[in-house]
Curated annotation (Swiss-Prot):
A Gene Ontology term for the protein's cellular component: cytosol
KW Magnesium (keyword) present: yes
Name this protein carries in UniProt: Mevalonate kinase erg12
Catalytic reaction(s) noted: (R)-mevalonate + ATP = (R)-5-phosphomevalonate + ADP + H(+)
Purpose of the protein: Mevalonate kinase; part of the second module of ergosterol biosynthesis pathway that includes the middle steps of the pathway. Erg12 converts mevalonate into 5-phosphomevalonate. The second module is carried out in the vacuole and involves the formation of farnesyl diphosphate, which is also an important intermediate in the biosynthesis of ubiquinone, dolichol, heme and prenylated proteins. Activity by the mevalonate kinase erg12 (AFUA_4G07780) first converts mevalonate into 5-phosphomevalonate.
Compositionally biased spans, kind Polar residues: 9-29
Residues the record lists as binding ATP: 99, 231, 236-242
Protein encoded by which gene: erg12
Cofactors named for this entry: Mg(2+)
Organism: Aspergillus fumigatus (strain ATCC MYA-4609 / CBS 101355 / FGSC A1100 / Af293) (Neosartorya fumigata)
Amino acid sequence: MGNPRGRRTNGSIKTSKGTQRGTVSNLLSDQPLAARPKVSIVSNDDSQDSSDGGAFTTPSTTESTLKTTINGTDSTERNMSRKPSSPMAPAFMVSAPGKVIVYGEHAVVHGKAAMAAAISLRSYLLVTTLSKSQRTITMNFRDIGLDHTWNIDELPWDVFHHPSKKKFYYDLVTSLDPELVAAIQPHADAVSPDKPEDVRKIHRRSASAFLYLFLSLGSSQNPGAIYTLRSTIPIGAGLGSSASVCVCLSAALLLQIRTLAGPHPDQPPDEAEVQIERINRWAFVGEMCTHGNPSGVDNTVSAGGKAVVFRREDYSKPPTVTPLLNFPELPLLLVDTRQSRSTAVEVAKVGKLKDEYPVVTDSILEAIDQVTLAAQQKIQEISTNGISYRTLEDLGTLIRINHGFLVSLGVSHPRLERIRELVDYADIGWTKLTGAGGGGCAITLLRPDIKEEAVRELEEKLSAEGFVKYETTLGGDGIGVLWPAVLRNGTDEEGGEEIDQQKFENAVGTEGIERLVGVGVQEKREGWKFWKRSPRFS
């Protein structure tokens, strides 16, 4: 199977100061790292389709241009090129947030509206290109113990690129092709042979999503690469961890085949929206590999950030998405029950209830829809001066009502109810389950006038009963890119600090990851750029 690991020596990519890097896509300056200015990208949106056998090669001088901005002044645009013998592409990183469904879970699967908001817990994907002789791809998802390498030349390219099967980066894919799924199955089944079956099941789903996207968007001439993922999002807790990963994979692969432009400060709003939607569509394909029949809300909010009201009545058509760009940043108490559950199982539970009691279940789903729409109206009325206490109370009341309907659908859990009981007793906010239920997490919208002592007492009780608390914020950025994977934490003379792959893999916990890559609330470093929705699309 070739190089069994496909890894680079010492797991890092080092470039001495003053050495020019190879240029890949429209995202690199050809200046030395130490003197690299802030960069904005100008690119033609239809640069290349993914059927090109050389999809991962650098664009020619006629295919891309780069506009740099130094101290606020645009420099002359210049074409980029590199010789075939130029160095390998530098490592880059993408990051996408988790989400909470604030209103409308389960109803959204049945064509109703849901409101979801990005949270400050995120996934990070480091992409390291290997030498030409290393014909392997490695998927290293450290936080779930998945680390597997495939030989690129042994993958089923003939099936994925058959004229009757081939999909292009701009296509809308609303269902998985059974023949393509069957073609990757042996390769997905090969992962983690020594792991317990419950772990292998998770690993196989992750591998299936990765391979389906890789084979759909790439080509047999792809260079070898290592895809290293770390996440601060609790897994299996209803926080969109799998969608966050799929958004990262989608963005990374689309960047590698040069079909994304930007992000940059002066990117036209319609172009940014096209880029977000392109990432989102392929992330949804990955989600189908993972969940079977996902609603699409998780990947939509992870790709675009902030908050959205989402409705998908016809799965053969794109969903209706209304961004809520004035969604206020609200501190949230997020509590993990530590009770694992399956989204597919909980969705099937509601489906069965609907089959047995269609009129009653439809009434509950319609009521949840009305809760979501009422909350949307409240948020759209928020002024630039911030949210009023009355509006916050209204949103809290709707959270409480929504939770009651979810209990009626049978998707709560005793540990979720215990969290709600403890929070209600402390009287610090309004609580509901978020996501599929059956375990996972509860969210509490906090009152603005709570006493610190009450919060501390609640935290002690939650900890004593085995719950895990996260402090997070609603309404942050969506998909972002750090290209190259350099932290802008030095002076202009010093350049930046490259992300060492070994350090990235070994970062401990949420704080360690955030401290290293710096996107979350605790740390923010210059260098990350995010695609942002425009008010014209709200």
